[in-house]
Amino acid sequence: MFEKVNPCHPDKVADRIAGALVDLAYKKAENPRIAVEVLIGHGVCHIIAETSVSLDKADVTAAVHRIAGNLTIDYVEVPQDGHLADNQADGVRCGDNGIFKGMPMTEEQKTLSQIARDVFSVYPYDGKYILDGDRLILCQSNVETQHLREIYPDAEINPLGDWTGGTDVDTGATNRKLGSDMADSVTGGGLHGKDLSKADVSVNIYAFLKAQETGKPVTLCCAIGDNTVDGKPYTEIVETARSYIRSSGGFEKFAEWGLV
């Protein structure tokens, strides 16, 4: 049983905005410290950014408008806490306490992830999809149900009829669709709106990739300030995640679909 949402679901719109701001921070510094929370809906986008580099309000506004439309923006930016900053003063260390799990993807998860991408490539609007054994449920906005039924004749499609979706119908918040992003690898923390020093980003990515490579579950934990995780220097964990994010096209692009 697995649920997947597409990049235009309001929660994913929030994730994408958060990712775009992290991308902005990385344009200003090689290793910025930033954590972004976004709440969006009904014409308003609220953002709080804790960051070691100041972001230009015009760049923030441009990112929000590009991703979510011409919304009213409430942007609050504050410096990173001094104790947290001191943790990274002499090198990259684990940025938080955490527990982490990497799980090999199931065939069901792979199948639904591909279906979600296929549908979204034709209908780039808010949508949510479920696969439970042989039961496929497709909720796709801004489409005539009959069109999807021709492609997926055995699926349950838009059970309440055609709908519009988007942030004028539903609110979105950062890291609220972790099941969609991580499948069985969900544990304590979210992937989005954070720099690579954050274990929620780097260790989650590392554990997920290791699970796909080995075909076995991976369980890890770390304490803030740790220099090693899974017997590897934390800097190596971070570089693994950095390469993955780059291969995805950056933090905003990574936020579209997550790891799955």
Describe these PLM feature segments.
Residues 1-260:
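A domain-level signal for the structural core that forms small-molecule/cofactor-binding pockets
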